Amino acid sequence: MKVFAKKVFKGENPNIKQWDEPTIRQFNGKEVYGRRTKGYGTSEFNYAGKLYKPEPWTEDMELIKSKAEKWASEIMNRPIEFTFCLCGLYETGDDSIPHHSDTIPTLDDVVLGVSFGGTRVLEWSNYANPIKAHTNTSQVDLNNKGEPETTQFLVEDGDVYMFDGHSQMKTTHSIPPLIGCQRRISLTFRSGL
């Protein structure tokens, strides 16, 4: 399952006052310079080699989280609770994420992303066969999987996208570099942690 919707969160503002500094790490044999990030919630989360011990939800983040849970619960037709949010700052068009598959605890858990600020492209690549052994990993095997069908979506201020563990078994996604774009904040809420 994957869902994209326009302007659901238009007018909201996470008001993140202080960001954690980025880290440099290896990803698919390449050195990747990360973005500035911040973690909020009640559960720890390991992302890109860093263990996030989240800050408590701020009032602004709690409002957005509640709206995200309500929206996700309506789409999924069952209660959804988000226990962690990874906030990412894209200061310029050089800030990007290569194609990857998210770690999701179970096939039924969900990730919901909300975009604030500048417009970016979200690339979504679908493979015919599974690219992961199980959903609770970000390790992918693209050998002999064939060419993916890739779709691009413009992600604008207030837009939301959501996917579950089932979708991550056969897909990757990325935010490629984009020259001349404005500052963007991404909130990625997670269930099942």
Task: Walk through the language-model features, giving the residues of each.
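Non-heme Fe(II) oxygenase metal-center motifs and adjacent flexible, charged/small-residue loops
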Residues: M1-L193
